[in-house]
């Protein structure tokens, strides 16, 4: 997932994971609201609702995400969404060997990001959908 400081919302491609996970309607999807994409594309990207994903990174850190679902090419995590969930997001300019990360202000949960091809990515495994979405992670 690309960590995007310019994204207004976190969004995932509709066909990224087809495991029976439900897509929940949102006010925006019900109203047919679309989002302006970055770049030269002029057509709005329609909000199709949201899904919940439970994630585990390579360090064993668990979290969850509720991205909007849309006709996008790759998953984006908005820095603003991380901030709204209580994470401070750090992209160090010094000590280039220090990874970028997001640290939760209440419980110190830390999500570590990799810099690849000039962008920051959060490398995770998506946990299989079990039909039970009650588990809540920071």
Which residues are covered by each model-predicted region?
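Pepsin-like aspartyl protease folds
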Residues: 9, 27-50, 75, 111-114, ...
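Beta-strand elements of modular eukaryotic interaction domains
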Residues: 1, 41-43, 79, 89
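Basic, gly/Ser/Thr/Pro-rich low-complexity segments located predominantly at protein N termini
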Residues: 11-13, 44, 83
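Aspartyl protease active-site motif detector
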Residues: 1-32, 68-71, 78
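Aspartic protease core domain of the pepsin/retropepsin superfamily
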Residues: 54-138
